[in-house]
């Protein structure tokens, strides 16, 4: 039974990242990541770099509510496929960076080293197969809505029911869990 409980948790994780990775349409009929309406995606795909991270963080911090008012969200998580964590550590933990003129310059992202949580998620690599793997910056879910997992009756653990049947040795198990993955906001 414990293996089934772990499998259910892995399936929830898979569904969350699948929704993000496949850029599903959300409640407004637009894709979750949409340059025109949501303004939450870079123009071209790239691996994490100081410039790309700064651009994505600015897009996040410039988000507005449906009435056009600034909502002042701060970046909290950097969600990366396996392998980009090394690059992220270099981006956030280096006080200085090399410039094209071969000099040292202050790394503006160094100040965020204690505020941004790096999340390396292998599910992104699996979903991408051999294709390029996207990465994401998100706000604190306590500050704004994001991807949410809701559970039937708030029960976050699988329900186990054991039964016996006359004439059979051993037990029969019913193991079930109900959840839904949804997007509250972009």
Give residue spans per PLM region:
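Alpha-helical scaffold segments that mediate packing/assembly in large oligomeric complexes
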Residues: 1-63
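Sequence/fold signature of self-assembling virion shell proteins
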Residues: 35-62, 74-77, 83-186
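Short, conserved, surface-exposed binding loops centered on an aromatic residue
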Residues: 65-72
């Amino acid at each position: 039974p414990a293996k089934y409980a772990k499998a259910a948790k892995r399936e929830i994780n898979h569904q969350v990242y699948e929704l993000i990775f496949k850029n599903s349409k959300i409640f407004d009929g637009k894709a979750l990541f949409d340059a025109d309406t949501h303004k939450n995606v870079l123009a071209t795909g790239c691996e994490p770099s100081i410039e790309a991270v700064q651009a994505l963080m600015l897009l996040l911090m410039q988000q507005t509510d449906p009435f056009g008012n600034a909502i002042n969200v701060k970046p909290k998580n950097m969600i990366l496929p396996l392998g980009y964590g090394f690059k992220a550590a270099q981006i956030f933990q280096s006080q200085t960076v090399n410039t094209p003129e071969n000099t040292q310059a202050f790394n503006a992202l160094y100040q965020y080293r204690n505020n941004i949580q790096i999340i390396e998620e292998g599910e992104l690599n699996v979903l991408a197969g051999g294709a390029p793997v996207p990465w994401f910056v998100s706000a604190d879910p306590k500050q704004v809505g994001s991807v949410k997992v809701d559970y039937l009756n708030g029960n976050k653990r699988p329900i186990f029911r054991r039964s016996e049947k006359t004439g059979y040795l051993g037990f029969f198990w019913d193991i079930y869990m109900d959840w839904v993955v949804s997007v509250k906001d972009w």
